């Protein structure tokens, strides 16, 4: 939890939740894209929606940003209803979508100037705000460059600068680092820290299918699948709730037969999964040496262990525990 969110949490009634969602549902014919989704976001909090493509994350964001009317349920953004007070909601929010929204035939500065004027900024205030945001995202030196000449990572940074140019109280980030290389992705993550320092009470909703991104950026995370929120808490609390602390992966030189699979389960391996005929994954409590016991069991049965790794539980393990499948496989 961020410092601002921590302070807000100790002052009940002093700072209402800027985002409140209750039973929000969206149907397209017989298909239910979002099914009675409920949650709230505190002032200064970064709240993550983690799930695979098709989980309903983007549909939910489109409803919260007034681009799509809900079938039922309600949502209030900065105290305003997303259906009956759409103009007020739009004034309070900033958005960064998956798609590129900047004009590639304008310069970096011109793109921000157009955005600022749409929100009523002008004159010195607009010039100062453009300079501030471009420095924050590391694009000041490229302010006069045509947008079409920017790299993918730079374009994403420009999109984020546009989203926060008018100093919104709430920011929606829909898959902000999709398609970026690891170095560009980490640069975006670091940039969020700088933006957060400048606006400690800014509330952020971040959608992502990258568990590392949710773990790094979010104070709380909701695991989404098939239009529903399955669980919600801080990343650390979600991982602790598995009652396990280590993720074990083991690979043998030949397929593991059913009899030996049952023997592995009897060794206390939690959330047991056979990723392939020769590769087994499971979770275990720290210090119990379950991984090494399973390795010895298989070696005693005549298998040769070609790979054994033991790591900490991740949010992907949380997703698997709630859905029975891996996040990367969806």
Task: Label each region the model flagged.
Residues 113, 117, 124-142:
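Conserved ABC ATPase "signature" region
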Residues 73-81, 89:
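Conserved ABC transporter NBD signature motif
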Residues 167:
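Conserved catalytic motifs of ABC-family nucleotide-binding domains
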